[in-house]
């Protein structure tokens, strides 16, 4: 393709609102254009890369017998009401009403549509299992779109759904998908980790996220060097080993603590370590308020709270809620004397006695509070985030932390949707049973950004060979000079039958062309310049920056050698 005919509106300056490396490079390289907050047009270079990512995804899906379909983005509310998600999904669901008053959503996922489709068409165990997938635009009304394509309101996604007669069949497809995802991300030359994760609003009993390692990542990955253990910090289990100090219970004492509102301030005031302080917080679970106790150096994990209670409806109580329950401010909460609501405590609180807690009165705290004597705990559990250095759940050693971008996720949905939507099949005994489901997503546009986050330098993008928009970039330094133009034209005509070639034939300064070439990041650059009359060109390896001068008779061999070095 001749660059003079292409649409690549590169920028010289980094846009001020671009808040990640990939966002900056996508804009500077003329690959995307913002239409609205979190909404982008994909320009020719980006579209070529997306096409290649999608091609790899299709190959691996078809290799495990996935069948491609295309479902509507516009989904009627009736189907979402059947599953119960029309009421529960939340503000991220983009809803609308047509001229006839009928309600619709722009789909963030397609569980309802696919379940409706399959329940109407597949009635016998003989037709199962089946796996259907699509690649389509999705929509989510993000409160704060950020990081360009990493958190947008419209995004491209591959979503697949499998239907089964038995759990064993689901297990097999789940593992096939897990392996296929690993192959896809390996082919994209991504550094990634599959991690144990939470299923969120989609639901299900078992799930893994695929995380691309990146400093900009919004998720924290917990892993160890001693095994392949990895978990999203939301799901990383804290293994409790009792370590109770058997000290004498002291007399409960109320202490005046003027201006003390945080656990750290209380620790400083009492001259205690932070881990000896107990924080109290009130949480609304469904329609009930409960109190949670955790040690001062720990943080409450709402995902674990949701899992413990089996609900998606968990939120921190407001200041007004707290005052109506305990007539106290958040900075002075404590369990002593609390009997209106149930009290739950993190496992590690069991190791303490003579606790320092709030007194439910501004500027006062209790010291020497003890469980059973001064207050009752209904249940203990793992309610907190793990800390770096604590033992991993599989016993393989201390956990380490890394940041990651979620680029894919696989779920075992079970019968969550088939039961609520009456998607049944007849088993070999002629009895109706709910289909057992799995669902599997890859953020295609998100993956594009993740690749750029990992593959760049201070000059621009460095594309992995599998998804580079073009394989060879021919640059005519001065197309006004006939010798240079003729040789560049000749090389373009010769090599475009063997490679995907972008030919910069523009009447631009050499510096502009070289800067654009570095920015766009095509792996091999062939520069036709002052030595064109002698048949000499410069060949540059974008990945290493190495450049050599070769005669055009040896150009093919040189290009092949560079690509061979990428493979090794």
From Swiss-Prot:
Q: Provide this UniProt record's keywords sorted from A to Z.
A: Aminoacyl-tRNA synthetase, ATP-binding, Cytoplasm, Ligase, Nucleotide-binding, Protein biosynthesis
Tell me where on the tree of life, at the top rank, the source sits.
Answer: Bacteria
From the Swiss-Prot or TrEMBL record, state where the protein is found.
Cytoplasm
Main subcellular location: cytoplasm
Q: What is its EC number?
A: 6.1.1.15
Q: Which GO terms describe its molecular function?
A: aminoacyl-tRNA deacylase activity; ATP binding; catalytic activity, acting on a protein; proline-tRNA ligase activity; transferase activity
Q: Which GO terms describe its cellular component?
A: cytosol
Query: Does the keyword Plastid feature in the UniProt annotation?
Result: no
> Example GO biological process term?
prolyl-tRNA aminoacylation
Keyword ATP-binding among UniProt keywords: yes
The main enzyme category here is: ligase
In the record, which residues are listed under signal peptide? Answer: none
Give the reactions, separated by semicolons, that this protein catalyses. tRNA(Pro) + L-proline + ATP = L-prolyl-tRNA(Pro) + AMP + diphosphate
Assembly, per entry = Homodimer.
Q: What's in the domain note?
A: Consists of three domains: the N-terminal catalytic domain, the editing domain and the C-terminal anticodon-binding domain.
User: What family is this protein classified in?
Assistant: Belongs to the class-II aminoacyl-tRNA synthetase family. ProS type 1 subfamily.
Q: What does this protein do?
A: Catalyzes the attachment of proline to tRNA(Pro) in a two-step reaction: proline is first activated by ATP to form Pro-AMP and then transferred to the acceptor end of tRNA(Pro). As ProRS can inadvertently accommodate and process non-cognate amino acids such as alanine and cysteine, to avoid such errors it has two additional distinct editing activities against alanine. One activity is designated as 'pretransfer' editing and involves the tRNA(Pro)-independent hydrolysis of activated Ala-AMP.
In Swiss-Prot or TrEMBL terms, this protein is called: Proline--tRNA ligase
Organism equals: Macrococcus caseolyticus (strain JCSC5402) (Macrococcoides caseolyticum)
